[in-house]
Regions:
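Conserved glycine-rich FAD pyrophosphate-binding loop
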Residues: 1-124
């Protein structure tokens, strides 16, 4: 049964991965309203990880979801989404100051941006 439900989540057009402190993940789930509509949610209270299939996600919904994740000291990433959505939005959640360090390392190691262009946070 678990594999069937996990497979159903994989069919959703959007998949969110969230990582939270153990004492914040339940509060985060409690604050979610019906936007965006979740198809399946898997929680691992042992490590604070959430995987959620989303049937629809507007740019505004994503921005609000990122705010809620930040308010609960979490990190969110959209691991699956349509190409158009991924081009318009940063799928790694709210930009963070430490991304600049990753960008400098990437620029030093790959000055021609050959390896995995656009795959680091901040579309680098």
């Amino acid at each position: 049964k678990f594999m069937n439900e996990f497979g159903e989540m994989g069919q959703a057009p959007f998949i969110l991965r969230g990582d939270f402190p153990l004492d914040r993940v339940a509060d985060f789930i409690g604050l979610l309203d019906d936007r965006p509509q979740l198809s399946k949610v898997f929680l691992d209270f042992g490590c604070g990880r959430l995987l959620a299939g989303l049937e629809d996600l507007s740019d505004g919904d994503w921005a609000r979801l990122c705010q809620k994740i930040d308010q609960h000291d979490g990190h969110g990433r959209l691991v699956k989404g349509p190409d158009g959505f991924r081009k318009r939005n940063v799928v790694f959640g709210t930009p963070r100051p430490e991304w600049k360090v990753m960008h400098r390392i990437k620029a030093a190691m790959d000055p021609d941006n050959i390896f995995a262009p656009g795959c680091l946070p901040g579309k680098v």
